[in-house]
Regions:
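Gly/Ala-rich beta-loop-alpha elbow adjacent to hydrolase catalytic centers
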Residues: 213-217, 221, 428
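Cap/lid segment of the alpha/beta-hydrolase catalytic domain
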Residues: 88-92, 127, 132-206, 249-250, ...
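Short beta-strand/loop motif that positions the catalytic acidic residue
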Residues: 421-424
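Catalytic-loop region of hydrolases
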Residues: 19-128, 288-293, 302-380, 480-490, ...
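A catalytic-pocket lid/entrance helix-loop region that shapes and gates access to the active site
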Residues: 223-225, 230-334, 460, 480
Length: 544
């Protein structure tokens, strides 16, 4: 096959390259891009893709086991009323159609080394749209499973490693440009170059462009809306980790207080007793006792109800110091000087997962942020944390909010017709669900009440852990919901979601647009969504 170069004109800041003609896959290898280089372009036969092995980064004990490819730190797949597991899931690659796989290295700064991949389905199977997918944890790898899901649905898709290898923050030490890359630049540059490649391959720009991510990916999504409102027509942002260094230091502060106070640490063997007490107090508030709190905001559980009798300390009770720790876990962490909320408290219903944030080993992502960004010392010991000084150090380490995405003014995104679909597990033990409620309300307060239900919607998912997993109905096609909203202009007010055990659906429930909650109609199976109605509930506000 004769290889031919594609003539590309650098047209504007918002589009680094455009193509004068459609292309074959291999010809994309010589596509001229600004501050970027195509390193490979090859056809992949249907069902033939095998993802590369995840990177191994020495020096972070247990990182691979906790974070995994998506950086979700193992929240999915533990415990819960129905086991919470999603085992025996089919491979996302086995049924993929043939596609053109393009790998690109981006160098927007002299210290940038951002890897992206762009997958382009054959023209007959392309739906004419583009879906970028986000990362988790500290990123450091391409999100292949999410790309596969997007490709299988007919999208041209892209993902980035955000400019470093491995799901740790060690890249940040001495490399401020790499912090900028993971903060916001990598995803924007990925978006620009992916659109150029799509245009070059099909001789047509995508009709609609979407971003779909959870956790770090959720933050990446709202960062795009805040900083680059023209990049996407619609954004799915799940479990948005928008708090940056505030969130990390807030967790460290609570954890430090718990571990430094004699007898205050709550060991995992006591979690079931606390969880059972919460369910006893609040599970019936929605009219259905099913091991799931439909609206944890309405739960008024006092851990003191579990306080041990004098001289006792068993797995079924909490010592006075542990009672205070439980109250602290449920309560927002606040700046000791200003009183500002650093991160929200965990919701009732999260108890089986408390070890995700609070354990003697510490919360890995927060420790890494403190070591490599706040303290700039890889040997920093969390045991030396001093709230009086270290909270401020952490905040000053990110003076330009590179890692923080709390700006509620996304009017420019909405003015273009952009749609923001937020979702969050009420039982998320890692990115507190209160944070989603607060950001959603902040946007409405800033931009105006008229955007609620028109441009922004939030869906709180009872019983769902971090991004997925747990006893709640955590499975629904987020991209399809967003696409329907963008295409029809009709905002969803109810999404039917499923709970799967070993790949089989054993429950469906409606996920209601916040602040509504699902109410059982009083007849029919409580495992069938058609027997529930979305209705208003009185207790819906987040932390102030």
């Amino acid at each position: 096959m004769i290889r031919r170069a594609l003539l590309v004109a650098v047209a504007a800041a918002s589009m680094h390259a455009t193509s004068a003609m459609a292309a074959t896959c291999d010809s994309l290898s010589v596509l001229a891009l600004q501050n970027a280089r195509v390193t490979s372009a090859q056809l992949v036969a249907a069902g033939a893709f095998t993802p590369p092995a995840p990177p191994v980064v020495p020096g972070r004990e247990g990182a691979a086991g906790r974070a995994g490819a998506a950086g979700r730190e193992g929240a999915a797949g533990r415990g819960g009323a129905r086991g919470g597991g999603r085992g025996n899931q089919p491979s996302p690659y086995a049924m993929l159609p043939a596609f053109c796989r393009v790998a690109v290295t981006l160098t927007p700064s002299s210290d940038s080394d951002i890897k992206i991949e762009v997958w382009l389905p054959d023209s007959p199977t392309w739906n004419g749209k583009f879906q970028a997918v986000g990362n988790g944890g500290w990123a450091g790898t391409i999100s292949y499973p999410a790309m596969a899901n997007a490709l299988a649905a007919g999208y041209a898709t892209t993902s980035t490693d955000t400019g470093h290898v491995g799901n740790t923050a060690s890249f940040a030490l001495g490399h401020p440009e790499k912090v900028t890359d993971i903060g916001y630049r990598a995803v924007h540059e990925m978006t620009v170059q992916a659109k150029a490649i799509i245009n070059g391959y099909y001789n047509s720009a995508p009709k609609y462009s979407y971003f779909n991510g959870c956790s770090l990916g959720g933050r990446q999504g709202i960062t795009e809306a805040q900083r680059y409102p023209a990049d996407y027509d619609g954004i799915v942002a799940g479990a948005v980790a928008w708090g940056g260094m505030d969130r990390y230091v807030g967790v460290i502060m609570n954890e430090s207080a718990m571990l430094k106070t004699s007898g205050a640490y709550i060991p995992p063997e006591k979690y079931p007793a606390v969880h059972d007490a919460v369910l006893q107090a609040c599970d019936g508030l929605d009219g259905v006792k099913d091991g799931i709190l439909e609206n944890p905001l309405a739960c008024r559980f006092d851990p003191k109800a579990l306080q041990c009798k004098a001289g006792e300390d068993t797995v079924s009770c909490l010592t006075p110091a542990q009672v205070q720790s439980a109250k602290m876990i449920y309560t927002p962490a606040k700046d000791p000087k200003s009183g500002k909320v650093l991160t929200g408290g965990l919701m009732p219903g999260t108890e089986l997962q408390w070890g995700t944030l609070y354990s003697p080993q510490g919360y890995g992502n927060a420790i890494e942020a403190m070591k490599y960004i706040a303290m700039k010392d890889p040997n920093w010991d969390p045991a030396t944390f001093n709230a009086a000084t270290d909270v401020e150090k952490a905040q000053k380490a990110d003076p330009e909010s590179t890692l923080k995405s709390d700006n509620p003014n996304i009017k420019a995104f909405f003015d273009r017709g952009g749609k923001l679909l937020m979702y969050q597990g009420f039982a998320d033990p890692q990115v507190t669900s209160d944070n989603a409620i607060r950001y959603h309300q902040a946007v409405i307060d800033k931009v105006g009440k008229h955007v609620e239900g028109k441009s922004i919607e939030l869906f709180m998912i009872p019983g769902m852990y971090h991004c997925q997993g747990g006893p709640g109905t955590d499975t629904f096609d987020k991209a399809a919901v967003l696409d329907s909203w963008v295409m029809s202009g009709k905002a969803p007010d109810r999404i039917v979601a499923s709970h799967l055990t070993d790949g089989k659906v054993d429950r469906t429930r409606p996920i209601c647009v916040f602040p509504k909650v699902a109410k059982w109609n009083g007849t029919g199976s409580t495992d069938d969504a058609q027997n529930f109605t979305c209705a208003a509930d009185g207790t819906t506000k987040g932390t102030k």
